[in-house]
Amino acid sequence: MTQSQHSQSAREALAERIVEAKTRKNLTFEQINEGTGLSVAFTTAALLGQHPLPADAARVVAAKLDLDDDAQRLLQTIPVRGSIPGGVPTDPTIYRFYEIVQVYGSTLKALIHEQFGDGIVSAINFKLDIKKVDDPEGGSRAVITLDGKYLPTKPF
């Protein structure tokens, strides 16, 4: 039976255990994800408390991280989503995404509405991909793809 959380505390505590096990075992999220049949972005979000994992995927990651049966079951529960507490984020990496939305949010909204009409881009029917590529000017660039289904507003 599908279970749902009523607060973030249990999944937050499990996320701490997962990060500790990942560090202790010197694993990457990609290595933990292998064999789940899911994207590394989805599995990582689940391990950090933002999605439930299917039973088979929960078994795979629990075995790799030496998590007990209770933790494996908790990974399958529907979490209370949203990992950033109220206010402006203070972590520099997360803040940059906040800054991107502050600078480009109205542009994204205008272009989405111009191309698709009145509606939203789903964060539920959604895919995320991150790639590291060489910058021709030196260093590296992060190519981040946000792929969400467009959902039109329906008059009623």
Swiss-Prot record:
Among the GO biological process terms of this entry, one is:
cyanate metabolic process
Root EC class? lyase
Keyword flag Lyase: yes
Q: Which GO terms describe its molecular function?
A: cyanate hydratase activity; DNA binding
What keywords are annotated for this sequence in UniProt? Lyase
Which residues constitute the catalytic centre? 96, 99, 122
Q: What is its EC number?
A: 4.2.1.104
Q: Which domain of life is it from?
A: Bacteria
Name the reaction it catalyses: cyanate + hydrogencarbonate + 3 H(+) = NH4(+) + 2 CO2
Give the UniProt family note. Answer: Belongs to the cyanase family.
Protein's job:
Catalyzes the reaction of cyanate with bicarbonate to produce ammonia and carbon dioxide.
Q: Which PANTHER family match?
A: CYANATE HYDRATASE
The record's HAMAP family line, in alphabetical order, gives: Cyanate_hydrat
Q: What is this protein called?
A: Cyanate hydratase
Organism (species)? Burkholderia pseudomallei (strain K96243)
Q: Gene that codes for this?
A: cynS
